[in-house]
Amino acid sequence: MRSTMLCLSLIVLLGQEPPKESWSYRSFASDFERVADSTSGLPMTERVRVFRSTFDKLYPSLYAHPDQSRLDGRIEKALTYFPSIRSTYDQVEPKFPEALANAMKEFRGAFPDFTPQMPIYLIHSLGTRDGGTDQVAGRKVMLFGADEIAQFHWDESLQPFIVHELFHIEHSRHFADCDQLWCSLWQEGLATYTASVLTPDASDHQLTLDVPHPIRRDADAHWGSALCWMAEHFDSTNPSEISAGFTGGPKPATYSGDRRLAPLPSRFGYYIGLRVAAQAAKARSLSELDRLDNQAARPVAARALAELMQASHLSCRLPAKQGSITYYAPRSP
């Protein structure tokens, strides 16, 4: 494999007229592999040093972290476990550009004016992400993690996963990241819903609703508790609660109102978000939902969640119709 800079205009990869603006893609996946190979016989401290030196030259700040010791630990772990994912990892880089182009073509069928206003990079994420936007050297970029893709998306789920991430880029033009839990519910729910709409008969695997375990099954088994927990924490800015719902962090302990304790699965917020988005889509088109800003989206999300709760005849408190919205509270990377 080799690192490449590709200008992926539609005339080359999609067989259509060239767009007014092109979009850029670059892979650093093989650069990680070269570091892993060239340092395999060295002490780990030296391997980490070579990694840092190499990527500081290739793209300063690509692997920045305020806690240097924590970053070194991630580098060490990534180098140590790389052999276990290598066979699949090696398939990601050659497969990814075509999957990205196909996903872009599919996505523009629903959002014809879409053009990413940020570069797209494929990297070894050191186990931190399969995809997502981030700030690198003061610039907003889309990062795809080849290591996580190798574990979760190397099969038929790759293109729907890319569609999910492209929606986040599109949605960010209208909806800003905000601190409340409902913001993640809305963002991830709409992205998952978009992937489901653009992937007919999509499986839960294609929608990443099976990581780290089957989310739909476990959430449906405790559906009332899941909805009530989400309503209770709708405006929460507590990082541990948001992590519990969306990032595979500690499971929400329980919902312990007037009913028995019911464990909720990690990342269940993605599934609840999908159901909330589908409920909201009964009254508005996907394009209309995408274009709602934060102030307009909050009551729509709250109403959709409330309708799901009422349909299930739940007695717990509905989400508040109004609530404050704050932005950009610092979180631990």
Describe each PLM feature range:
Residues 1-7:
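Sec-dependent signal peptide recognition
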Residues 7-20:
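Bacterial Sec-dependent signal peptides at the C-terminal "C-region" and cleavage site
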Residues 17-76:
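N-terminal mature-domain "stem" immediately C-terminal to a signal peptide or N-terminal signal-anchor/transmembrane
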Residues 18-39, 110, 181-231, 308-314:
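Post-HExxH zinc-binding segment in Zn-dependent metallohydrolases
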Residues 49-55, 119-129, 212-215, 294-298:
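Acidic helix-start/capping segments at beta-turn-to-alpha-helix junctions
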Residues 55, 227-332:
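Pan-zinc metallopeptidase signature
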Residues 74-213:
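Acidic/His-rich structured neighborhood in mature extracellular/periplasmic domains
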Residues 90-101, 220, 270, 291, ...:
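Generic detection of long, well-ordered alpha-helical segments
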